[in-house]
Amino acid sequence: MTTKKTSPDLLLVIITLLLLTIGLIMVYSASAVWADYKFDDSFFFAKRQLLFAGIGVIAMFFIMNVDYWTWRTWSKLLMVICFFLLVLVLIPGVGMVRNGSRSWIGVGAFSIQPSEFMKLAMIAFLAKFLSEKQKNITSFRRGFVPALGIVFSAFLIIMCQPDLGTGTVMVGTCIVMIFVAGARIAHFVFLGLIGLSGFVGLVLSAPYRIKRITSYLNPWEDPLGSGFQIIQSLYAVGPGGLFGMGLGQSRQKFFYLPEPQTDFIFAILSEELGFIGGTLILLLFSVLLWRGIRIALGAPDLYGSFVAVGIISMIAIQVMINIGVVTGLIPVTGITLPFLSYGGSSLTLMLMAVGVLLNVSRYSRY
């Protein structure tokens, strides 16, 4: 192992904290009306998000100082724990149901979403597998199939909740990691055909997914039903114009756009801060992606490279899906916007992941 740098990637730290700060401001702005109506406290969601942010930042700086090889050592145990929690959440009376998905476990006044932490555990485990078996990754039987086996076993359990959004991000992240490891294009084509068949099957197996597809193609066909959320999102994004209506001046958060502080927070941000504000957020994520790629390229070993690739891919895929949903480019999937959307498990997981990335940067050659 090369000598550790005196400090991690400072620009990555700054970008992360800047996104987090913007997120805290927007969570309050987006949720104040609903929080005041439901809890008689306009700061209800903002205070909880601030608590999650504090826990996440402490975890990020702690993990930043933990040798990333520790995750390699404990990756199997982490996977076992996450699999156990994923099964536990399916048990009636243990798992909590929200918006049709049994994805949470109650812990006092709060709840955790095990599938979020499975994403990071999967990255640590798959990076270990790929770094040890890279010479076999071009083999369909000895490399490609075993790598995907553990991924899809977790995906199937997550789909029992069901949580297509989180499962899609996890699988997409792992596919990028396997591709970077050197898997053959022909194997991905074969996987794509199987995946397309599976996707069609998943859509047809649940009426609400069919409604999501039809509302995506033509949301105005059912403006008060399946198309309501995306229409209200577009009503937020469009009027924002170039400079926005002003911070705190959103109209859609007045009970038009459901739960605007979660998956659709980018719509409120675009309405209040306009095209300029939305572009700034995309620019910040682009810089974060650039720093992550540099860290992956400069990592001293394959494990560090694969971990960095996995983390930055997870963030990038989640950003693309979330903004794609908000702008009507893809069907609604229920994915948070990293660092900005309200949600304790998602925010804590993302900050922990950045902590791992920062530790890899302390060994990076760039």
Curated annotation (Swiss-Prot):
Principal location listed in the UniProt entry: membrane
Keyword line: Cell membrane, Cell shape, Membrane, Sporulation, Transmembrane, Transmembrane helix
Membrane spanning stretches: 10-30, 50-70, 77-97, 105-125, 144-164, 185-205, 227-247, 264-284, 306-326, 337-357
BP terms from Gene Ontology: cell division; peptidoglycan biosynthetic process; regulation of cell shape; sporulation resulting in formation of a cellular spore
GO MF term list: lipid-linked peptidoglycan transporter activity
Cited function: May play an essential role not only during sporulation, but also during vegetative growth.
Similarity section: Belongs to the SEDS family. SpoVE subfamily.
Protein name per Swiss-Prot or TrEMBL: Stage V sporulation protein E
